[in-house]
Structure formats: structure tokens, C-alpha cells
């Protein structure tokens, strides 16, 4: 049986893979595993210490169904559900800590298309769960029904009316220099950032032009947001803005565009923030944490600045693990997941946007000038849809194609092939001295993957 949890929670097509029944079972299992008191002590006493779980979601249509199912699972185990509504994933993580909840649940499929949805669980303090805890929850999902509380022991559903304001006050602490005079276009992806991001940036003083900020439940990530940067690029040029920011469906990512429409990806953002934090004496151990997907240009820029780079597997959970184990202060991914542990336990697109604009305001430099600290090697990424991503990635013919590509590139580039943690695809990434070489090498390797798929 395939593992229920992927690299970022449980995901699938809503009502087919991720059903209401599964959502209820996950809510129930999480309550049993993560609550701090047992069901046996929580059956009849109205004076008992209530266990609490924060529950949030993005605006996709299936979120309402899955939210109701998760809450049913929680309350059936005697856990109160503190419903915070449509909020970014990092807000739910923060509020899990701020409300001193036992755990938190975010219902979102992030950058995935509208038919998909997902369930992500945060432990105490808003931290992502480790593999062992996820495995135990999965065991409980498959274990079936158990004796449950009755009467006053059943959990209640509460609404946190101050949730958004509380998160915005927290995010605002990331502002080191007021943003007065800066004009920013923000693409909210018709997602969880639709209200939070424009408010956060305006509160910091920026002139904000919000686009794709009218969620219907059906239009999340639909040709917009951080996976469709051409939209914000065009808007920045049209409005003559200083920069553009693009979030994904749950706003844990942030990518940027300079005034000319040039994309500033997560690698470049990390370089900008690392240099700023080094200057301020805030870069712990003079170290940045990045993943194997980060461009070689990031490593060269950090080496020139005397900053060490710790490299992890792909996925912000692995970045988080390295940040926590090494007590580092900055890490992230090329995709725009940027983590600053002093501000949160997970990637926060809005905090990233505020920090990036603060650096612009502090230095008086344009985003293009700041991004010039890093020069990326041409990078080509091809996603190949396959039936069994793990088997295909390990096929002898595919490994042979990768070895041949590595021999061809030598010291002038690199290749990375890996199964996606969230989609049924194998990702082929190639960096080379010139784009033509990168494309040709990537195409050959992708063809070998496709033939196996």
C-alpha cells in the first residue's frame, strides 16, 4: 500500500482520491495522535481541559466539504475545532502556536490546480510533523473506529474572528524599513493571499495593485500566481510598478519580478536576503540552507560573500529540518518557499515579500540591482508524466541516460533527476553554460524517462 502522506501532507483529486471519508478519518486520527489528554479523561466533565485544533483552508470549492469532514473527525474525538477560515498556510502554522493549540490543520493543495486538494497537519508550535508521527497517524486512519466521547465530551466548533488581524500583526514585524513610495503589483492567484497580502503590503506603506484577488472557489491558480509569472510580469510593465510579487494558492511561496519584467526567483531572493541578514549580523552561523534544485549561481554568489550553503533534498520540510537542527536563520527553495525561523515555522510568502521590499527601501536600490548579486546558469526543467514515478526514475535506461548527460556536462553544469513528492511526474533539471546545451541534454534525458513511463 502506498504511503498516504507525501512530502507536503496528503494530496489528491478532491472527492476521488481525497474524499470526505478520508478527511474525517484523518481528523480523527490526528486528534488521537496529537492531543495531549486521552479520550478516557474527556468523556463527561464539563470542567475538563479542552483540546484545540486550528483549522484553515484555501478558497477552492472542495475546501468547504473537506473542512466540514476534518472538523467532524476532530470533534468526534473530543477536540474543539478553532475555525480560522480562508488564510495562508503560514498563518495557520503561526496561529497554531499563537492560540496555544494542540495542533493545526490546513486544507489546501498549494499551487496545484483547482480539482486537487490536500490536508497538511502541524504539530504543537506550528511545526510540520516528522515521518514517524505521520506514519502513526496513517496507522490510525487504517485502524478503524474506536470508542468515542459522548455528551459534553464531544468537541465544539469555534470561529476565530481575529485570526487574520492577528496574523497580519505578526507578519508586519518583518518590516525593517517602511515601504512608502514603492509601488508593487501582487498576484494573489485567486487563493488564500487574496485578502492578507494586499493588506499586509499596504499596512507597510506600499502602493499596492492587487490582481487575481477575486476567488470564486473555481479559479484558484488558473493561469495566475507564482506558476504563471507572465501575468504579473505584464502587469508590472503596464503599471510602471517598482516590482511585482506572485503567490501560490496557499501563499507559502513568493516569487518576484523587477521593474523591467525580469523574474527574480527563490534563489535570487535568498541571495538578497542572505546578504542583508549577513550585513545586519542576523545570518546565524553565516549559513544559508538551500535544496539540490538551487542554481549553481546561488552557490557561487554565496561563496563570494563568504557565506556557507547547506544543501538538502527538495521540499521545504527538509529545509526546515536542517534549519532546526543547525539553528540556522534562513533557508528556502528556488520555487519561492523562503523560511526565516524567527518569523515562522514554514515558508511564508507574505513575510518574504515584506522582507524583500524592506531591503529595497533600506538600500534605495531597485530589485534588478539587488538581484544582480547572483548570476544564474541557464536551467531547464522538464516534468515528465509517468505511471510509476519511483520505478521509472530508477530504471536502468534512465540511469544510463543520466550518466551520459553527466559525462557530457562535466564541470560546466549539472543534472538532477527525481520523482516529484506531490505529483505523478519525474522532474528532469539540467544546468549548463548555455541554454541550448541545457535544453538538448534535458530533452534527451526526458525522452528516456518518457519511454519508460
Swiss-Prot record:
Top EC category: isomerase
Cofactor(s) required, per the database record: Mg(2+)
InterPro entries: A-D-PHexomutase_a/b/a-I (IPR005844), A-D-PHexomutase_a/b/a-I/II/III (IPR016055), A-D-PHexomutase_a/b/a-II (IPR005845), A-D-PHexomutase_a/b/a-III (IPR005846), A-D-PHexomutase_C (IPR005843), A-D-PHexomutase_C_sf (IPR036900), A-D-PHexomutase_CS (IPR016066), Alpha-D-phosphohexomutase_SF (IPR005841)
Active site: 110
Catalytic activity: alpha-D-glucosamine 1-phosphate = D-glucosamine 6-phosphate
Keywords: Isomerase, Magnesium, Metal-binding, Phosphoprotein
A GO-annotated cellular component: cytosol
Signal peptide: none
Residues the entry annotates as binding Mg(2+): 110, 248, 250, 252
MF GO annotations: magnesium ion binding; phosphoglucosamine mutase activity; phosphomannomutase activity
Role: Catalyzes the conversion of glucosamine-6-phosphate to glucosamine-1-phosphate.
PANTHER family for the chain: PHOSPHOGLUCOMUTASE (ALPHA-D-GLUCOSE-1,6-BISPHOSPHATE-DEPENDENT) (PTHR42946:SF1), PHOSPHOHEXOSE MUTASE (PTHR42946)
Name of the featured protein: Phosphoglucosamine mutase
Amino acid at each position: 500500500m502506498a504511503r498516504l502522506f507525501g512530502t507536503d501532507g496528503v494530496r489528491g483529486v478532491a472527492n476521488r482520491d481525497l474524499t470526505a471519508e478520508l478527511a474525517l478519518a484523518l481528523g480523527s486520527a490526528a486528534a488521537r495522535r496529537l492531543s495531549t489528554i486521552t479520550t478516557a479523561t474527556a468523556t463527561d466533565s464539563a470542567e475538563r481541559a479542552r483540546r484545540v485544533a486550528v483549522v484553515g483552508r484555501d478558497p477552492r470549492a472542495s475546501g468547504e466539504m473537506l473542512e466540514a469532514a476534518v472538523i467532524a473527525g476532530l470533534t468526534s474525538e473530543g477536540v474543539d475545532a478553532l475555525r480560522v477560515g480562508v488564510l495562508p498556510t503560514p498563518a495557520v502554522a503561526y496561529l497554531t502556536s499563537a492560540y496555544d493549540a494542540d495542533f493545526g490543520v490546513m486544507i489546501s493543495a498549494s499551487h496545484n490546480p483547482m480539482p486537487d486538494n490536500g490536508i497538511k497537519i502541524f504539530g504543537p508550535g506550528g511545526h510540520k510533523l516528522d515521518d514517524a508521527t505521520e506514519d502513526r497517524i496513517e496507522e490510525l486512519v487504517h485502524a478503524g473506529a474506536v470508542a468515542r466521547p459522548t455528551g459534553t465530551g464531544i468537541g465544539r466548533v469555534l470561529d476565530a474572528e481575529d485570526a487574520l488581524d492577528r496574523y497580519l500583526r505578526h507578519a508586519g514585524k518583518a518590516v525593517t524599513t517602511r515601504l512608502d513610495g514603492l509601488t508593487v503589483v501582487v498576484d494573489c492567484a485567486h487563493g488564500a493571499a487574496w485578502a492578507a497580502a494586499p493588506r499586509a503590503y499596504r499596512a507597510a506603506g506600499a502602493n499596492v495593485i492587487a490582481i487575481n484577488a477575486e476567488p470564486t472557489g473555481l479559479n484558484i491558480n488558473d493561469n495566475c500566481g507564482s506558476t504563471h509569472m507572465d501575468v504579473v510580469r505584464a502587469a508590472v510593465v503596464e503599471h510602471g510598478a517598482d516590482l511585482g510579487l506572485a503567490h501560490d494558492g496557499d501563499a507559502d511561496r513568493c516569487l518576484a519580478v523587477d521593474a523591467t519584467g525580469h523574474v527574480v526567483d527563490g534563489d535570487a531572493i535568498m541571495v538578497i536576503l542572505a546578504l542583508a541578514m549577513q550585513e545586519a549580523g542576523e545570518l546565524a552561523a553565516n549559513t544559508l540552507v538551500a535544496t539540490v534544485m538551487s542554481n549553481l549561481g546561488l552557490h557561487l554568489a554565496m561563496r563570494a560573500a563568504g557565506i556557507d550553503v547547506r544543501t538538502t533534498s527538495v521540499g521545504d520540510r527538509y529545509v526546515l529540518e536542517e534549519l532546526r537542527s543547525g539553528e540556522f536563520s534562513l533557508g528556502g527553495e528556488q520555487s519561492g518557499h523562503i523560511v526565516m525561523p524567527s518569523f515562522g515555522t514554514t515558508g511564508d510568502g507574505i513575510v518574504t515579500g515584506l522582507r524583500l521590499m524592506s531591503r529595497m527601501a533600506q538600500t534605495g536600490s531597485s530589485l534588478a540591482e539587488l538581484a544582480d548579486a547572483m548570476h544564474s546558469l541557464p536551467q531547464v526543467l522538464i516534468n515528465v508524466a509517468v505511471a510509476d514515478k519511483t520505478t521509472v526514475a530508477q530504471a536502468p535506461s534512465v540511469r544510463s541516460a543520466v550518466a551520459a548527460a553527466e559525462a557530457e556536462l562535466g564541470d560546466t553544469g549539472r543534472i538532477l533527476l527525481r520523482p516529484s513528492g506531490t505529483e505523478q511526474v519525474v522532474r528532469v533539471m539540467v544546468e549548463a553554460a548555455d541554454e541550448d546545451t541545457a535544453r538538448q541534454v534535458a530533452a534527451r534525458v526526458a525522452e528516456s524517462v518518457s519511454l519508460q513511463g
